[in-house]
UniProtKB/Swiss-Prot annotation:
Ubiquitinated by RNF216; leading to degradation by the proteasome. PANTHER family: TOLL-LIKE RECEPTOR 7-RELATED, TOLL-LIKE RECEPTOR 8. Residues 1-26 form the signal peptide. InterPro entries: Cys-rich_flank_reg_C (IPR000483), Leu-rich_rpt (IPR001611), Leu-rich_rpt_typical-subtyp (IPR003591), LRR_dom_sf (IPR032675), TIR_dom (IPR000157), Toll_tir_struct_dom_sf (IPR035897). It comes from Homo sapiens (Human). It is a single-pass type I membrane protein. This is Toll-like receptor 8. One of its GO terms (cellular component) is endoplasmic reticulum membrane. It is linked to Immunodeficiency 98 with autoinflammation, X-linked: An X-linked disorder characterized by onset of recurrent infections associated with lymphoproliferation and autoinflammation in the first decade of life. Mostly males are affected; carrier females may have mild symptoms. Features include mouth ulcers, fever, poor early growth, hepatosplenomegaly, lymphadenopathy, polyarthritis, and non-infectious enteritis.
Length: 1041
């Protein structure tokens, strides 16, 4: 029995091991890129690994990758094995490693800078670009490949630049060494070995800005085209410094001897506030120069001789100096006939607030000038005569007069500019014009001495940006695209009179934001500029009390009225928006962040031309209140609307009727950042053109069972930042149009494969899942297999698709999860039925063996005998009349056999019976089994003296089977039972034998007077054949067969 169980257990274990090994083979390789996102772009293969919390270079990067971005990680070591096998790399970005900014989220990471083994990049023979910015490197890495053409070491701790580090890089074209020793670094000076750059004969760009140099490095290669020496503490530029740089096109010397007043960073001026000393012949060999930056060098005079040999100079930056006098005289301007951009911003005299601006007549010589920046000159009034020198410039298209605190301006002067496209007057003090008189409520004699800082107070500067020059577009590109632009934002035009813009009839883009305007527009204010197409009135206090507002602007296409909530918040004030219906060309209307919760008289918006409406940041939760049906159709009249933004409206639910009254022409619907717990998906059937549905930032708990039942046009579905915990099976079953599905930042613990399977060809190309608390058990394996089967579906930032449970998997990506111990459902079913079958069979076999063993054995032998027929065997010679089998270990039984049974059979007066006894007749030295077989075979009968104990012993069973074997082999029934105790009461064999040959079963009598009869009967049974005493009824029935 035990052996049978052992064998079945071993078989089961072997089967499980085989199944597990198959699973291991199937799961150990994943074809989806991880932890990086790999993509093809033109002829390049790019691996995007930035900001993935990596602590080492991943070994899973494909060997065909050409560009590898490892920036913003926690990598601390680069070794010779880091890029092994990546011989195709042409660009490596290791900027910001370790990422100190985000180190608090990984306290186990020690940040001592990036440690690079010598020669770690040497075997990358195709490497062209190597970016190692902000890595706390103490020196230039050694053993760099000669193939490098660009090397960036910005924001490190490199204080010594020697030939040993870069002399071998003969193919280098761009070298960035800026921001290594600047104002917040503990260093005294940057040491540059003499002639260190001399051997770099192909070098075209060299950046040494924000280092403590004190002088221009000597022996610079003549191949240089761009040289950045900003904020390098250089006080003197000699005639020899740039003598050999005949190919130089860009030179940045800004920040040397800086103007430090109001500086938003630690600033050290030159002694006595002196300006940088530039030799008059310092630039005489720079004949190819196109760009020169002398900003913040405390210049008070401009030497015209500097520009004598600069015939191609196009951009000149002179910001943050003391050049008010030079702007007035302008002798140097005569040397710049091809100058296109001139920046003279923030050259004001501290404490001075002149009435007018004074510019030189020599400005008229700048015939190629396209943009003039004069921010921060600081004056009170701009007259036509002041800009007379500029009016004849044929190419001038941009005038920047921002942050000048101008109070009055004669707009008529701008009519004299033939090609002017951008007029930037933001952040001044321009007041309303009423009856040709400027209204000023400011003290004209006062001047705000606190000039706005030229840079943000944020010390995290962009090392790649122009440190002093304002690089953002002056005007929104969307606005400037319509034509001539005027920016009057952040002024004091709190009232617009009919004559305000009478001298600017050709304005197409107008920005009047942040003027504290609380006017009731009546439809006449902009009559002088009827061709305006883009109007920005944001951040004012406009009162929409007149239904004719803005109707004079018949060509208006974009109207921005956002952040005018002042009067919309007041319930008792009239709120008219029906003026919108008067615009026949209006395409975009922005009413966001106005807290609109009530309208007057007319409750619906109407427009036949409007294409886009931004209604975010209002109070639709009140407008669509269950108890108020007036605004149910507020958007129904917008017949051609394609994009509607209803975000940030505090909506907890959307009435079905209100949703059905949205324009059927919608292609984009944004309902993000509300408080919706339920969304009626069935209503999407009313929008046959809807392509984008944005439901981000709500509290949705459930999704529809089948999206295809309600929309066939949807391409983008955004559901991030909700509370969705389950993705229904069949969610995308027949959706063929959906391309982008965003399920990030929800409560999904697992995703069933059936939820993403489609019956038709799917177009799904983007699936976002990061930020979900996935439960990484074997149930996630189904989704993992789907990921491997659908490589065309991009899952961005797989490193952020992480496990929340169980504890040992917490924080791991589901892609890195080891699922080899998991068994598939099919395999699990097969194993279950297999083990169930084996276990059941073993149990049934054990039960049958216990209950029906003899019956089976007997039937088997009867059948076998029937098949083989009767064969007479030669009978062995017998010496004994009977062999007595008894329990020799039982003293009472042994005594009964020797003194009673032997006496009455062998020593009786009647015919004696010769018995074979174990303790008397067995041969010494012969094996027990041999003695037993010999005793049974040499005796005519075998008598079993049975007790309860002996009937259970193996000795009895062995002797019984041997005696029974004679019946099979010799057809001789030799068995006789003497029952000293009632035993084998339920034995099928004993019951059958009692029916066939009852006399062969004797029981020791309880009555002593019956013992004589017992001995006589035993003697007769031993001396006669058993078959002569068979019950004829049974014998005859057997003989028939």
């Amino acid at each position: 029995m035990e052996n049978m169980f052992l064998q079945s257990s071993m078989l089961t274990c072997i089967f499980l091991l085989i199944s597990g090994s198959c699973e291991l083979c199937a799961e150990e390789n994943f074809s989806r890129s991880y932890p990086c996102d790999e993509k093809k772009q033109n002829d390049s293969v790019i691996a995007e690994c930035s900001n993935r919390r990596l602590q080492e270079v991943p070994q899973t990067v494909g060997k065909y990758v050409t560009e590898l971005d490892l920036s913003d990680n926690f990598i601390t070591h680069i070794t010779n094995e880091s890029f092994q096998g990546l011989q195709n790399l042409t660009k490596i970005n290791l900027n910001h490693n370790p990422n100190v900014q985000h180190q608090n989220g990984n306290p186990g990471i020690q940040s001592n800078g990036l440690n690079i083994t010598d020669g770690a990049f040497l075997n990358l023979k195709n490497l062209r670009e190597l970016l190692l910015e902000d890595n706390q490197l103490p020196q230039i890495p050694s053993g760099l490949p000669e193939s490098l053409t660009e090397l960036s070491l910005i924001q490190n701790n490199i204080y010594n630049i020697t030939k040993e580090g870069i002399s071998r890089l003969i193919n280098l074209k761009n070298l960035y060494l800026a921001w290594n020793c600047y104002f917040n670094k503990v260093c005294e000076k940057t040491n540059i070995e003499d002639g260190v750059f001399e051997t770099l004969t192909n070098l075209e760009l060299l950046s040494l800005s924000f280092n403590s140099l004190s002088h221009v490095p000597p022996k610079l290669p003549s191949s240089l085209r761009k040289l950045f020496l900003s904020n390098t503490q250089i006080k003197y530029i000699s005639e020899e410094d740039f003598k050999g740089l005949i190919n130089l096109t860009l030179l940045d010397l800004s920040g040397n001897c800086p103007r430090c007043f109001n500086a938003p960073f630690p600033c050290v001026p030159c002694d006595g506030g002196a300006s940088i000393n530039i030799d008059r012949f310092a630039f005489q060999n720079l004949t190819q120069l196109r760009y020169l930056n002398l900003s913040s060098t405390s210049l008070r005079k401009i030497n015209a001789a500097w520009f004598k040999n600069m015939p191609h100079l196009k951009v000149l930056d002179l910001e943050f100096n003391y050049l008010v006098g030079e702007i007035a005289s302008g002798a140097f301007l005569t040397m710049l006939p091809r100058l296109e951009i001139l920046d003279l911003s923030f050259n004001y005299i501290k404490g001075s607030y002149p009435q007018h601006i004074n510019i030189s007549r020599n400005f008229s010589k700048l015939l190629s000038l396209r943009a003039l920046h004069l921010r921060g000159y600081v004056f009170q009034e701009l007259r036509e005569d002041d800009f007379q020198p500029l009016m004849q410039l044929p190419n001038l298209s941009t005038i920047n007069l921002g942050i000048n605190f101008i109070k009055q301006i004669d707009f008529k002067l701008f009519q004299n500019f033939s090609n002017l496209e951008i007029i930037y007057l933001s952040e001044n003090r321009i007041s309303p014009l009423v009856k040709d008189t400027r209204q000023s409520y400011a003290n004209s004699s006062s001047f705000q001495r606190h000039i706005r800082k030229r840079r943000s107070t944020d010390f995290e500067f962009d090392p790649h940006s122009n440190f002093y020059h304002f690089t953002r577009p002056l005007i929104k590109p969307q606005c400037a695209a319509y034509g001539k632009a005027l920016d009057l934002s952040l002024n004091s035009i709190f009232f617009i009179g009919p004559n305000q813009f009478e001298n600017l009839p050709d304005i197409a883009c107008l920005n009047l934001s942040a003027n504290s305007n609380a006017q009731v527009l009546s439809g006449t204010e902009f009559s002088a500029i009827p061709h305006v197409k883009y109007l920005d009135l944001t951040n004012n206090r406009l009162d929409f009390d007149n239904a004719s507002a803005l109707t004079e602007l018949s060509d208006l296409e974009v109207l921005d009225l956002s952040y005018n909530s002042h009067y919309f918040r007041i319930a008792g004030v009239t709120h008219h928006l029906e003026f919108i219906q008067n615009f026949t060309n209006l395409k975009v209307l922005n009413l966001s962040h106005n807290n609109i919760y009530t309208l007057t008289d007319k409750y619906n918006l109407e427009s036949k031309s409007l294409v886009e409406l931004v209604f975010s940041g209002n109070r639709l939760d009140i407008l669509w209140n269950d108890d108020d049906n007036r605004y149910i159709s507020i958007f129904k009249g917008l017949k051609n609307l394609t994009r509607l933004d209803l975000s940030l409206n505090r909506l907890k639910h959307i009435p079905n009727e209100a949703f059905l009254n949205l324009p059927a022409s919608l292609t984009e619907l944004h309902i993000n950042d509300n408080m919706l717990k339920f969304f009626n998906w069935t209503l999407l059937q009313q929008f046959p053109r809807l392509e984008l549905l944005d439901l981000r930032g709500n509290k949705l708990l459930f999704l529809t069972d089948s999206l295809s039942d309600f929309t066939s046009s949807l391409r983008t579905l955004l559901l991030s930042h909700n509370r969705i915990s389950h993705l229904p099976s069949g969610f995308l079953s027949e959706v063929s149009s959906l391309k982008h599905l965003d399920l990030s930042s929800n409560l999904l613990k697992t995703i069933n494969k059936s939820a993403l399977e489609t019956k038709t060809t799917t177009k799904l190309s983007m699936l976002e899942l990061h930020g979900n608390p996935f439960e990484c058990t074997c149930d996630i394996g189904d989704f993992r297999r789907w990921m491997d089967e659908h490589l065309n579906v991009k899952i961005p930032r797989l490193v952020d698709v992480i496990c929340a449970s169980p504890g040992d998997q917490r924080g791991k990506s589901i892609v890195s999860l080891e699922l080899t111990t998991c068994v598939s459902d099919v395999t699990a079913v097969i194993l279950f039925f297999f083990t169930f079958f084996i276990t059941t069979m073993v149990m049934l076999a054990a039960l049958a063996h216990h209950l029906f063993y003899w019956d089976v054995w007997f039937i088997y032998n009867v059948c076998l005998a029937k098949v083989k027929g009767y064969r007479s065997l030669s009978t062995s010679q017998t010496f004994y009349d009977a062999y007595i089998s008894y329990d020799t270990k039982d003293a009472s039984v042994t005594d009964w056999v020797i003194n009673e049974l032997r006496y009455h059979l062998e020593e009786s007066r009647d015919k004696n019976v010769l018995l074979c006894l174990e303790e008397r007749d067995w041969d010494p030295g012969l094996a027990i089994i041999d003695n037993l077989m010999q005793s049974i075979n040499q005796s005519k009968k075998t008598v079993f003296v049975l007790t309860k104990k002996y009937a259970k012993s193996w000795n009895f069973k062995t002797a019984f089977y041997l005696a029974l074997q004679r019946l099979m082999d010799e057809n001789m029934d030799v068995i006789i039972f003497i029952l000293l105790e009632p035993v084998l009461q339920h034995s099928q064999y004993l019951r059958l034998r009692q029916r066939i040959c009852k006399s062969s079963i004797l029981q020791w009598p309880d009555n002593p007077k019956a013992e004589g009869l017992f001995w006589q009967t035993l003697r007769n049974v031993v001396l006669t054949e058993n078959d002569s005493r068979y019950n004829n009824m049974y014998v005859d029935s057997i003989k028939q067969y």
